[in-house]
Amino acid sequence: PKYKAWSDIPILLPGEKTSTRVEPGKSLYGKIEKLEDKKGVIDIGIWTGYAWGDKPRNRAAVVAIGDNKKNVIGITEEIANYFWSIRNDFEFVAPTTTLENSIDQAIFYLNERKNKKPFIISDMGDNPTAGGSGDVTWTLNKILKNEKLNKINGPEIIYASIPGPDLIKNALNTKIGDEVTGYVGAIHDDRFSPPILLKGTLKSVELGDPNADAEVVIKVNNINVIVTNRRKPYHYISDFEKLALNPKNTDILIVKIGYLVPELYDIRGCLLYTSDAADDETS
């Protein structure tokens, strides 16, 4: 292309606030499709900035390229000005609350629901793809200590996930169906909760994942804890199915990925965000 235009915007927004499912993100990104049809415009891009990168250069930007100088510059300025005008209108794509309230609402939902769709809690404060260490044990510790959740006939729960090289080492020397014990979590971030000595039944083992390296499922009563050798976000249904877990039919699904990709979003019965380690307060 002959021309490129770039406009910086002094804004930082987490992904949980810039979803195209809701306004104003829907209208902001919707401008691209409308304006790309202008003569001499090849491509338009909008970046919301990486809210977890503590660098002076970090900010939102609009970039356009094409062969028509006037249109390329005009479009860049138009979108950048619109972005700035709606900067205070961005909200979380789902309700946010404390973990304690999330658990209370999950239990209420399970008692009242009219379908088998899971209650999803996204622990965005420990999201390894957005500023979190991915190994904070605070949430898992609360769940394991909750008598309404951690019991033989309790709700079926999938917790994804917690790194635990110590437990992984022990699990790889254990047969499926046998009991295994080992420490998990708090290797990088123990500010909120120490490592947990996890004890349960080895349900499944998966080796060779490019992110996790090794994955195992440890069942504690009805709580299925995914333990990894290295931290890994669980975005897709296939991530669970290869571990013999069915997120569509579980009662409560806890993930650490912030906003949900469409296939997880579509199976939710209810969705809440909670936060502990890495806060989404960027102002």
What residue spans do the PLM features occupy?
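Single conserved hydrophobic/aromatic residue that forms the stacking wall/gate
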Residues: 273, 277-282
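Hard-cation-handling environments
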Residues: 13-221, 226
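A charged, well-structured terminal subsegment
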Residues: 2-6
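Conserved protein kinase catalytic core
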Residues: 129, 262, 282
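A C-terminal functional module that forms or caps the active site or interfaces directly
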Residues: 224, 229-272
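Short gly/pro/ser/thr-enriched loop/turn and capping motifs at secondary-structure boundaries
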Residues: 1, 166, 261-262
